[in-house]
């Protein structure tokens, strides 16, 4: 839902592997108003007059690097030592670097391209970024969101939604890191080594950098984090485009969170049958009458829904909506692992971001949560490394892992995983019934659920309300399809309470 979205070969020829995070052709997100005329001129020869021919259009935006005078690790030194080494300079990694370094902790961020623009598109609820003091990093807001449950029912959500400006957010975090004297090293990390009170990384250029704590913020595909349980994740799969179109049917003051309608598959019986069993929805951000971000999304599937299947459904949907794509500015492919077990707690490498288990198991949202939890993890790190006793080794690992995942937060996550397991059991009609009831509850509860703010008690209240106010068919779905996930949830909650 939030598109968590690195250059990728032709998506028509490639099928993603399960550990892929998300991949895009481009990283530049042009301003939807200021560059309108120049885009029309520049992309004129690449445009098309055919319905849905966006599959044949090469994205036109070019990768962009930021002009920031960051401080690099001195390569003349034989040995580089830091308190904290962060692998990756995505949103979670930079946010943690910013938060830890402001307490005087020596931080080094290692990434193959620290100044490159993030390829991801991020959508957040405006109130989430307001609470974090990051509202100035939003470049477009919609006062209302809508959910098309079916052709005959639409929900209007009075909760403003925003698109994150990747450039503004990364510049803000980088500039804070510069002020706090964070060092950067341009390389890919190949190995992580551990001694009793010190760890080190080995980079692809042979460089070794040592530190008291290594934090993996490199994303879902990382091999540095260990698990002690089978990784039975669900997968969110999506194909998205930022496109110039002749026109589109969306209201400019409304962000379309979900469109579960399937009338576009009326002449596609094969696709319709599959969509009935494993549904996908359209997510749309309209910026003006000729610029829109469109994304066909499988909310969660296991095994992973075919990426080609998602693209075929998007072709049929845009054709039905009468959307003619003139040019594709950006194209993104998203594969997010959701739910499943947490990493082994504790372990020698700390994690933040996609590999840490903080992605919302029922929705795929993560960026706002990463921004909120990085200060929490930073506090646990500073309490150990910033103390006069300088706690290191196994005690440090125990403190930081339990700082990010205390027992109450683990129990809450189990409830969200139950939500994911429920979604996996539902077909299109069951999914419609669930969201019809979900968005009718007190906004406090659905706001809190989607923003990972509810306690176990509040989640129990939400569940009882949903069951009590759902249709009889929805109740039947819960009773007949969700018994096993419910028993598993209760067992896991009991274990976490020990």
Swiss-Prot record:
Annotated family: Belongs to the lycopene cyclase family.
Main EC class the enzyme belongs to: isomerase
Pfam families in the cross-refs: Lycopene_cycl
EC number: 5.3.99.8
Protein name: Capsanthin/capsorubin synthase, chromoplastic
Described function: Catalyzes the conversion of the ubiquitous 5,6-epoxycarotenoids, antheraxanthin and violaxanthin, into capsanthin and capsorubin, respectively.
InterPro entries attached to this UniProt entry: FAD/NAD-bd_sf (IPR036188), Lycopene_cyclase_b/e (IPR010108)
Cofactor stoichiometry and binding remark: Binds 1 FAD per subunit non-covalently.
Motif position, FLEET motif: 293-297
Biological processes per GO annotation: carotene biosynthetic process; ubiquinone biosynthetic process; xanthophyll biosynthetic process
Transit peptide, start-end: 1-52
Presence of keyword Flavoprotein: yes
Effect of residue 360 to K: Reduces catalytic activity 3-fold
């Amino acid at each position: 839902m939030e598109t968590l979205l690195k250059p990728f070969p032709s998506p028509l020829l490639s099928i993603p592997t399960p550990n892929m995070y998300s991949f895009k052709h481009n990283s530049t997100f042009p301003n939807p108003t200021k560059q309108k005329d120049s885009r029309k001129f520049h992309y004129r020869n690449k445009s098309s007059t055919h319905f849905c021919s966006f599959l044949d259009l090469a994205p036109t935006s070019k990768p962009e690097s930021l002009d920031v005078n960051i401080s690099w690790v001195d390569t003349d030194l034989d040995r580089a030592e830091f308190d904290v080494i962060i692998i990756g300079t995505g949103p979670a990694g930079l946010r943690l670097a910013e938060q830890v370094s402001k307490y005087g902790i020596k931080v080094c961020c290692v990434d193959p391209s620290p100044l490159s623009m993030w390829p991801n598109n991020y959508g957040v609820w405006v109130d989430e970024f307001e609470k974090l003091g990051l509202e100035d990093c939003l470049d477009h807001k919609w006062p209302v969101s809508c959910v098309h449950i079916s052709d005959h029912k639409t929900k209007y959500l009075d909760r403003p939604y925003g698109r994150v400006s990747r450039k503004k957010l990364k510049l803000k975090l980088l500039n804070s890191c510069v002020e706090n004297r964070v060092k950067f090293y341009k390389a890919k990390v190949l190995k992580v080594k551990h001694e009793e009170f010190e760890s080190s990384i080995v980079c692809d250029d042979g460089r070794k950098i040592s530190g008291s704590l290594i934090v993996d913020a490199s994303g879902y595909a990382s091999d540095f984090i260990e698990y002690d349980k089978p990784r039975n994740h669900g997968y969110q799969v999506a194909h998205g485009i930022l496109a110039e179109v002749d026109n589109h049917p969306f209201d400019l003051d409304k962000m379309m969170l979900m469109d579960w309608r399937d009338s576009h598959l009326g002449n596609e019986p094969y696709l319709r049958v599959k969509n009935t069993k494993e549904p996908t929805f359209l997510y749309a951000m309209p910026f003006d009458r000729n610029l829109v971000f469109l994304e066909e999304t499988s909310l969660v599937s296991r095994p992973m829904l075919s990426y080609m299947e998602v693209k075929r459904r998007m072709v049929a949907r845009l054709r039905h909506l009468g959307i003619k794509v003139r040019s594709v500015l950006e194209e993104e492919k998203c594969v997010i692992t959701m739910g499943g077990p947490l990493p082994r707690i504790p372990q020698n490498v700390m994690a933040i971001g996609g590999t840490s288990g903080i992605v919302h198991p029922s929705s795929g949202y993560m960026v706002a949560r990463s921004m909120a939890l990085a200060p929490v993890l930073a506090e646990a790190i500073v309490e150990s490394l910033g103390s006069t006793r300088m706690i290191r080794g196994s005690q440090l690992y125990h403190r930081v892992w339990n700082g990010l995942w205390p027992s109450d937060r683990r129990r809450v996550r189990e409830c969200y995983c139950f939500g994911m397991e429920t979604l996996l059991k539902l077909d299109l009609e069951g999914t419609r019934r669930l969201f019809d009831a979900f968005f009718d509850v007190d906004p406090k509860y659905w706001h809190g659920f989607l923003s990972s703010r509810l306690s176990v008690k509040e989640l129990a209240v939400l569940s009882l309300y949903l069951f009590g106010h759902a249709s009889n068919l929805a109740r039947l779905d819960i009773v007949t399809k969700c018994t096993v996930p419910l028993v598993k949830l209760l067992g896991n909650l009991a274990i976490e309470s020990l």
